[in-house]
From Swiss-Prot:
Annotated protein name in UniProt: Autophagy-related protein 18
The keyword Oxidoreductase appears for this protein: no
Compartment(s) of residence: Preautophagosomal structure membrane; Vacuole membrane; Endosome membrane
Chain's role: The PI(3,5)P2 regulatory complex regulates both the synthesis and turnover of phosphatidylinositol 3,5-bisphosphate (PtdIns(3,5)P2). Necessary for proper vacuole morphology. Plays an important role in osmotically-induced vacuole fragmentation. Required for cytoplasm to vacuole transport (Cvt) vesicle formation, pexophagy and starvation-induced autophagy. Involved in correct atg9 trafficking to the pre-autophagosomal structure. Might also be involved in premeiotic DNA replication.
Family according to the record: Belongs to the WD repeat PROPPIN family.
Positions of WD repeats: 1-36, 69-114, 141-182, 185-225, 230-269, 308-354, 366-406
Biased composition regions of type Low complexity, renumbered to the chain: 263-289
Biological classification of the source: Eukaryota, Fungi, Dikarya, Ascomycota, Pezizomycotina
Amino acid sequence: MAMNFVTFNQDYSYLAVATAKGFRIFTTDPFAKSYETKEGNIAIIEMLFSTSLVALILSPRRLQITNTKRQSTICELTFPTTVLAVKLNRKRLVIVLEDQIYLYDIQTMKLLYTIETSPNPSAICALSPSSDNCYLAYPLPHKAPPTSFTPPSHAPPGNTHISPTSGEVLIFDTLKLEAINVIEAHRSPLACITLNSDGTLIATASDKGTIIRVFSVPDGHKLYQFRRGSIPSRIYSMSFNTTSTLLCVSSSTETIHLFKLSQGQSSESSLPSPSAPQRSMSQSSLSNSPDEDETSGDKDSSEFHSRKHNGTLMGMLRRTSQTVGSSFAAKVGGYLPKGVSEMWEPARDFAWIKLPKSNPGPGGNGNTGPLRSVVAMSNNTPQVMVVTSDGNFYVFSIDLSKGGEGTLTKQYS
């Protein structure tokens, strides 16, 4: 059965799957089916933590809020254009259209605010699960061209160009209903953003997918900068663990990367919070730091096999050169300005997972494109949960002290 949509709930204790014939809800630890209905072609499903309330998109423009325990419909809403994403926490319901975002009070379903955005066909948006730090993040809208704008002579007649999503993130306080900051995260357009469970950190990736950055929220100070690799790749999913010590990232390379967030690795020293909302553009963010076009070794794709030869002469030479390089960078970096020293010390993944090759079974989607995946980390054990577009659910164990390659411990399909 084809999967239309798959997502974890806010604390990763449940997994929800939307299909062409209803939806299913599973517990993640242990993995077991919790609820199933075979009615309706469900395009999108979102849960509210572990409650019986779910938000469903039944047709392109129609939202239905359902109580699965009572098997009743709480309300239905119809929107002017296709609903591309739904986000919710205990205070707010967020509906994302291509060029609008609707904010609702989830208790009363009263419309609180409508945000006009630039075209956002990928529905890049993140809502904090926290009721206190109830922040919404989305790409900063582009300024509209002046009415007197004249297209260049070489432009085709009637040609209209829609600018791509910006690389800047707007932070919106959904309780105060006001924009509070803009984070200039990337030079390239955004591809993926996510907030941690406390609403105090945001991770960003651009459409090149080589650099992952983590900023504090709401002040927008850059705390970490990670290199996924040098080969451009589409980032499909990013997820913090509940303690915000690890960041898990999946992409079109079929390699899952885990980055460690520790105080010693922070690329920023302690900075005072701004006294008023402002555009956050630290020199470490864009102007003096390496960006997506920087070249470096990559552990993905064809180069991944090099990990398996660490006992060979080449492996020893590689480790030696890396050790010398890191030591040299640490010494030299101490004499350089902060923005320059970052170029010497790109932070790599702490651990990684290679997804097994598999053919989609009867429950897979049969797509021939890149294997898409959604990732989350277990609350109780050092494990990474991965759901793939071919209908598989994997659980990998991670060594939190040594890192390295994760071990597949469970698989369901």
